[in-house]
Amino acid sequence: YALPYARETPFLKRLPLVGKVLEWRMVIKICEAVTRFRKFVGWLAVINGVGVTVYTGLLLQSFPAVALWANPGVPLLFTVSAFSTAMAFLLLIMYTVIKDAEDTRIRLLYERIDLVLISAELVILFSFFFYLKRGSESAMRSWELLFTDFGWLIGFIGFGLIVPFFLELRGVVKGWTSHVPIITASVLVLMGGYLLRHYFMYAGIYAYPW
């Protein structure tokens, strides 16, 4: 879906290998087809994107022997995190590659959406804190692994959620004179998205027997 826009982006055209690939006859034909059936391809991309977003959490939830994963909040947390990292990636691209002055309103909208998504993640994690601490043996062991690990507390919750939250909040309320704070926030959100998935896999404790 984004291929026609990529062919119009000066930055990508200037890249040695990418610029040549974008001028291939096959790529041009694909761009023409995508432009012609733009609405259909767009909806197809939306369906595929939502499917990829949701399925990871649903897959983890299907393991009943792991209390950390067998939780209705897991698909919700992973879905919110996926949309948040998507917003962060778009902001990163718009501030570093595209740099179109006409996109100011869109960038501000993405910042507001990401702010809401980060807030939702923090609320969900707050509920996970009590669910795991007061849950089964498997849940309590997962709690110990997560909430005593500085990588989770400082890396994910601190730098992956709280710091970007305040950077984007300041940008939405008062604005920034430089793009650096929002770029920093976007990079931190992407890092936090990885750490969430890493620690969720790491802290899944199997309850035996099941």
Region roles according to the model:
Residues 194-210:
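Juxtamembrane boundary at the C-terminal end of a transmembrane helix
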Residues 1-3, 200:
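C-terminal halves and exits of single transmembrane alpha-helices
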Residues 182-190:
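Central hydrophobic cores of alpha-helical transmembrane segments
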Residues 53, 123-124, 189-196:
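Aromatic-anchored segments of alpha-helical transmembrane domains
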Residues 3-179:
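Long, contiguous internal "core" modules enriched in hydrophobic/ aromatic residues
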